[in-house]
Each structure stands twice: as structure tokens, then as C-alpha cells.
Amino acid sequence: MTWLQETYERNKRWVYFAFAAVFIWGMAAHGYAMLDNSFTHDSLSEFDANIFGDGHKIMLGRILVPTYRQLFRGDLTMPWFIGLLSLLWIGIAVFLVMKTFRIESKLIAGLVAGVFVAYISFSSMTATYINDLDNNMFGVMCAVCAVFLWRRFSWGWLPGIAFVIGALGIYQSIILVTVTLVMIACILDILANL
């Protein structure tokens, strides 16, 4: 059995819980927008990213968005698929937060999932910029993964740098997710050593 399979078997229950909690919160909070073609704002001009989207994203400094689109979803804006990808990335992020901070309570884990899914950036993007929702949530997952690697492995900050660069290449303000989680980790370390 490989290292990845062993890790999965050890954490299978929490992986399923994280994804179930994210999916339930996500459908309750944003199901209508994800299952409806109500395009607004940039979603109209980026319905087909080949027309305006890729060049515009690169000019804004979001240099990895075209690569992300080609790898994961293509150029068309399909709200249901974008919604599923977004929930997938947030599910991974929630699981990594649970492992980073060693959360063992289902109640706390469910609340963490609710915070990730219902926070204002997710809500506003779902309502107005659904064309960017999945790639931005991929950036959030990269930001969380960087903190997870930094906290769990002695040299984890090295690959963590690549994940921070990935988050910055998707959307620059996602760096705040990394900064916030690092601050929480530092505060918890200080409190543990009092």
C-alpha cells in the first residue's frame, strides 16, 4: 500500500465529512445560483473565455487563470460545473484546515465548512462573478495547502511557496487567506506556550 493510500485510509472519515458538510452548506447557500444561468457582470463578457477572458485575466495579473481553465473546465461558463468544482476545492481546503489545526470535533468542522462556503467573497462571486468562482476557490485551496505544508512538515514551507505562488497567480488578494491562517496558527502556538 502506498503512502497516499495509507493516508487516505487513516483520514477517510474526515474527508467524507468535510465534503459532505461543504456540499450541504454550499447547496443551502448557493444552490440556486449554481443551478441557474443568471449571468451578470463579467460573466456576460466571459461566457466564452476565448473572446475576452484570457487576455483580460493576464492583464490583471491573474496569469494562471488561463492555464487553470484549460486544465479543469475549459472556456465556457457553466454554473453547475463551476459550482461543483468550487465545492470540490473548498472541500479540500476545509479538510486541510481540519488537519492543520487538528480539529476532531464534527461540530467545529461543520462550522469551519460553513464559514468557508458562506463567507462574503464566495457569496458575492457566486451571485455576480460565477465565471471566476471555481478558479478563485482553487486559489483558496492553494493558500490553505501552503499553510498545511508549513505547519505539518519541517521543510513544508518550500513546497508551500509554490502553492502561495499558485494562489497569487489565480487572484492576488487570496494571499490574505494564507496570512490569516498563519496568524491563527501563531496565536494558537502562543496560547499553547503560556
Language-model-derived ranges and their functions:
Residues 1-11:
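Short, Lys/Arg-rich, polar N-terminal cytosolic tail immediately upstream
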Residues 66, 87-99, 118-121:
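Central hydrophobic cores of alpha-helical transmembrane segments in multi-pass inner-membrane proteins
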Residues 10-40:
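Transmembrane signal-anchor helices characteristic of membrane glycosylation enzymes that use polyprenol
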Residues 178-194:
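Perimembrane helix-loop-helix junctions
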Residues 28-48, 56-68:
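Extracytoplasmic catalytic/substrate-binding loops of multi-pass membrane glycan-assembly enzymes
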Residues 58, 62, 86, 107-151, ...:
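Membrane-interface micro-motifs in multi-pass membrane enzymes
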Residues 55-80, 84-89:
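Short hydrophobic/aromatic helix or loop-helix immediately within or flanking a transmembrane segment
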Residues 143-157, 189-193:
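Membrane-interface transmembrane helices that cradle and orient dolichyl/undecaprenyl
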